[in-house]
Amino acid sequence: MARINYAQLMAKYKAIGKGAVRLTQSSLYLTLPINATQTIYNFEILESQTANLTADQIRLNINDEFICTTLGIYAEGELTIAGVGTGIKRLFTYAPVENVATARLFENLYSGSLQISVNNIVFLDKFDTRKHEFIPQTQFGSFAAGTQNATQSNGQYSKVGMFPIEPSLTLSGSKKNQVQLQLPTAIATGCNVQITDNTGGTTNYAINRVACLMRGLNAQNGSVFQS
């Protein structure tokens, strides 16, 4: 966020008659269910697109614009208890094969590419998802007798998996936005990951969605619908 020049952005909006635009730090969080036969995922951007909308997603209002400065691609897991989903979500920055071999089912998420276009003009192309793969350190070997092996990663989502978008790109609520994830092969469903903490306790997650997290600025009333 430190690279953004607020004064320059406000000057650009004033130059097109939008001096009343309010700029605030903001995020978009977009997810889609994993489909075992699908290699292309088109993330829905707007609040008005409800086909795949879930309660935890953050979408763009049609009256606003979003200026993206950093972006991350993740696998989204849902906490399960006795095989039943709880609605509690966690993001994965890699396929945790140290926990379960079937994690390789979604490993190709990090072998794809991202394309972003606005009104059919491509502003981001061939952006490899390998940039977003982050494999953290975990404690496999016991350093003292009786200490449990911990396979719980220390993901810090303010940094981990996020990559700067330079130059920044702008999505508009009044335009046709396309955020497309392209994979070499389909990623399979049915991956259940069990994570062990250093006390030996386990937590289970079902990997069932792909996620795109964007951070940047929201320009309230910045779209062409507003004067």
Description of each model-found segment:
Residues 1-227:
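Beta-strand-centric surfaces of beta-sandwich/beta-rich domains
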